[in-house]
A protein has these predicted regions:
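Noncatalytic scaffold domains of N-terminal-nucleophile
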Residues: 2-52, 56, 64-228, 232-278, ...
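Extended C-terminal subregions enriched in glycine
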Residues: 424, 457, 466-516
Length: 546
């Protein structure tokens, strides 16, 4: 862990919620018809119990960062199908004066040479998919820089739910049961997550006392127990016993990095993302391409609008898959991939009437998301994740620590910038988003869901900036998900005429009923005298506030 930085109380200015009006309509045209929350303080995430944990911190005098941390910690208990203590995390914070980015993703163990994997892909499960978990360092770093309440206070709701239990929600129960066949035989999984030999049912009480005890150790040591203490020793011992090469020295070497965000202008807004190794640049590339089309002249759910978005996303992913990696190993800087002339040239590759395969250009030389905002003007966009549901499936016995499988995103090909290597960060799917206008905060937002995430960022921004939809309608609207080549899946909420026309243009289109494949958006929009907070109906989520 890095030394505790100075808090930023001195350079924060008190912000009155002014100068930002709502540039959208107040219609809710989709079948969900969920309404936004309007309040001076707000927390949004995919689980109501977690949102209320954050709200409790605000009510006790904490700020939005305290609320975000408490929400994130509680999510490790009440939504274990998507994240845990062994997750990674990223965050963007508006402190009242400027943005701060935090990259708390972990690096590969020192023993992960290409030769260690024999030229084969990093597996998706087991200890050899686990990079150093970074979520704990994110909580500690965010609190050290911005927190107001005592660090241990932020853990209290999660510890209570771990010890006394919580009632499992229908969505979490469904995802839990669906993942059991994949993870049942991973070391430690059944003991932690199948105490009755099965996944819990909706409405059943689930207790996680080992998890609660671990959170108490983390709270008492500000995370040191996880990276250098008793918990680190347990992680190493479990790795040694199960064929992994992660060592206590890998955990001790971990650091979370404060970074400047990267950004792109879109229709008068500036969209901010965390720089690589994260894939936020995919959203910025796609939006930069769409800047060259008059999207506002096209109906929101028309084939013309959706086709252009799909084609822009394909081009953006082609570049990301070729060039994006740990930023210390990239041959190209993000600035070159976001060059306006380059994006203009990429836009010319789009055929308005036909789906085309996408190739990288040559520029010159399960996840949880949460957002919180307070009456002082502090806003937080934060995301943490195991990657594939329960991640690696590995759980360290007696600790409740379930471990992510972020190593699965490394490449095996020699010469690829994202090739697996010692102490290297892999390409990362989780991306918090933030929008400003003329240097002032407008919206903190995210769309969880693997490679859906940048696609969701693009679709939400197009709906708001081009089609004038309010953030709740932008969350509710039907979505597409590009898969590969010309393969696209769409929600059934699109008009039949749109789906038929997309097929006519050459998209290999499937429609699916499983809305969980299309991400889950949470967003907070800054109004003149408070916030508009929204939660996606595709999850159990809630916008809470006062």
């Amino acid at each position: 862990m890095t030394p505790r930085p100075e808090k930023h109380a001195d350079n924060r200015r008190s912000v009155t919620l002014a100068d930002v009006s709502a540039p959208f309509g107040w219609d809710f045209p989709y079948a969900w018809r969920r309404k936004p929350l309007l309040a001076a303080n707000a927390v949004c995430t995919s689980q109501p119990l977690a949102a209320q944990a954050g709200l409790r911190m605000l009510a006790e005098g904490g700020n939005a960062v305290d609320a975000a941390i408490a929400t994130a910690i509680t999510l490790t208990v009440v939504e274990p199908v998507s994240n845990g203590i062994g997750s990674d995390a990223f965050a963007i914070v508006w402190d009242g004066a400027r943005l701060h980015g935090l990259n708390a993703s972990g690096r590969a163990p020192a023993g992960w040479t290409p030769e260690y994997f024999g030229g084969k892909a990093v597996p998706a499960l087991g200890w050899n998919s686990v990079t150093v978990p970074g979520a704990v360092s994110a909580w500690a770093e965010l609190h050290a820089k911005f927190g107001k309440l005592p660090f241990a206070t932020l853990f209290e709701p999660a510890i209570t739910y771990g010890r006394k239990g919580f009632l499992v929600s229908p969505t979490v129960a469904e995802q839990w049961a669906a993942q059991v066949p994949l993870f049942r035989n991973q070391p430690g999984f059944a003991e932690a997550f199948l105490p009755a030999g099965r996944a819990p049912k909706p409405g059943e009480l689930f207790r996680f006392p080992d998890h609660a005890a671990t959170l108490e150790q983390i709270a008492a040591t500000r995370g040191e127990a996880f990276y250098r203490g008793e918990l680190a020793a347990k992680l190493e011992a479990h790795a040694l016993a199960n064929g992994g090469v992660m060592r206590a020295s890998d955990l001790a070497a971990h650091r979370a990095d404060w970074v400047d965000t990267i950004d792109a202008d879109y229709r008068g807004y500036t969209v901010h993302e965390i720089p690589p190794n994260g894939q936020g640049i995919v959203a910025l590339i796609a939006l930069g391409i769409l800047e060259h089309f008059d999207m506002s002249s096209l109906p929101a759910d028309s084939a013309d609008s959706v086709h252009l978005q799909i084609e822009a996303v394909k081009l953006a992913f082609a570049d990301a898959q070729a060039y994006v990696a740990d930023i210390d190993h990239m041959a190209l800087t993000p600035k070159r991939l976001l060059d306006k002339d380059y994006l203009r040239q990429r836009a010319t590759l789009i055929d308005r009437n036909r789906a085309k395969p996408a190739f990288a250009g040559t520029p010159d030389a399960g996840t949880v998301y949460l957002t919180a905002a307070d009456a002082a003007g502090v806003m937080v966009s934060m995301i943490q994740s195991n990657y594939m549901g329960f991640g690696s499936g590995v759980v360290v016995p007696g600790t409740g620590i379930s471990l992510q499988n972020r190593g699965a995103n490394f490449e095996a090909a020699e010469g690829h910038p994202n090739r697996v290597g010692p102490s290297k960060r892999p390409y990362h799917t989780i991306i918090p988003g933030f929008v400003t206008k003329d240097g002032e905060p407008v919206m903190s937002f995210g769309v969880m869901g693997g490679f859906m995430q940048p696609q969701g960022h693009v679709q939400v921004m197009v709906r708001i900036a081009d089609h004038g939809q309010n953030p709740q309608a932008a969350c509710d609207g039907p979505r597409f998900r590009w898969l590969q080549g010309t393969q696209v899946c769409c929600e059934r909420g699109f008009p039949r005429s749109t789906l038929d026309e997309l097929r006519r243009r050459g998209h290999e289109l499937t429609t699916v009923d499983d809305y969980s494949q299309f991400g889950s958006c949470q967003a907070i929009w800054r109004l003149d005298d408070g916030y508009l907070a929204v939660s996606d109906p595709r999850r159990d989520g809630q916008a809470a506030g006062f």
